[in-house]
Amino acid sequence: FDLHIRLAHRCGSLAQLGQILGQAGISLEGGGVFATGDSAEAHFLVADGERAAQVLRAAGLEVVAHTPVLVRQLNQQLPGQLGSVCARLAAHHINIHTMYSDHHNRLILVVDDVAAAAALTPEWQAQHAHP
């Protein structure tokens, strides 16, 4: 699941998030944080989105959403893979809301329709199980 959290853009916000999840035994498998102005949008890959959201909300953090993701493995030796995946989805009107990679160098995509996106991109199926 993609866990979307809105943080204050201040020193220590990300540390707080990491400590809360760590104390709850929840591992972050990939993600990123993007700050604009006074807030920061954090997206992290977790195995149990509902539990992670509950833990963070109980600690007073703003969880925007926890969403199923599409996991794909790109051939890093072949230039243009990202463009090919994105073009395939765009041609079928599937919008990509968020994209990042995980600790296994897999592409993590938050899209409009995970099932349809998966059916359209079988050649990029990730080989490893994902959270």
Model-derived regions, located:
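A conserved regulatory-domain signal marking ACT and ACT-like small-molecule sensing domains
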Residues: 1-131
